[in-house]
Design a protein with these regions (language model features):
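Low-complexity or membrane-interfacial segments used for flexible interactions
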Residues: 1-40, 46-49, 62, 73-75, ...
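A low-complexity, Ser/Thr/Gly/Pro-enriched, surface-exposed linker/loop concept
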Residues: 51-61, 68
Length: 185
């Protein structure tokens, strides 16, 4: 199964919801921001039922988010090893990202098992126009967002944990947004 969302580097810097849709163009989830100190995000179904919350932990040296999903509390944090590329870890599940986070091309793995793969999806001009027309109706995506070729695809290895995996991916996006704004400051 695959889900899609628009990666807007400052994804959570505004109060407009981010919509996640499936391969048929149906909105499956909506991510809404709450106006608080630090980020507080809610992952909702199209019927506004909360399936997860993602809250920034402000008292840390590195970007860290707490994900509450399926009765569990998971910590998603960014690691910056000195001689290697950065990666994220998810406590309690022993998940780790492998790949290129800042280019949105990575896998989430547990030991040697792939949980999900996230990658940028490039569209041709005709595909972008058709996609924009479809998304304009369902996802309220500005055309400028698509012109950058910044649609991300999440390919799930396990459909049973869809909300959990999606909440972790959105927490990773939030970690990357915090990290890029702090490193550019």
């Amino acid at each position: 199964m695959k889900l899609y969302y628009i990666d807007q580097r400052k994804l959570f810097s505004f109060m407009q919801p981010v919509e996640v849709w499936d391969e048929q163009g149906n909105v499956r989830y909506r991510l809404k921001s709450e106006c608080t100190v630090g980020y507080h995000l809610h992952l909702l179904t199209p019927y506004d039922e909360e399936v997860a919350s993602i809250r920034q932990n402000l008292l840390t040296m590195v970007p860290k988010f707490i994900v509450k999903v399926n009765g569990k509390e998971l910590a998603v944090s960014l690691k910056h090893p000195l001689n290697d590329s950065e990666y994220c870890t998810v406590t309690d599940l022993n998940w780790k990202t492998e790949g290129f986070l800042k280019y949105r091309t990575y896998q989430i793995t547990a030991e040697d098992q792939q949980i999900a793969k996230v990658q940028m999806v490039e569209f041709s001009k005709g595909e972008k126009d058709a996609l924009y027309e479809a998304l304009k109706k369902i996802a309220h995506v500005p055309e400028s967002a698509l012109s950058q070729g910044n649609c991300c695809e999440i390919d799930f290895s396990d459909d049973l944990n869809e909300a959990e995996i999606l909440a972790v991916v959105m927490a990773i996006e939030a970690v990357l947004c915090i990290d890029s704004s702090s490193s550019s400051a």
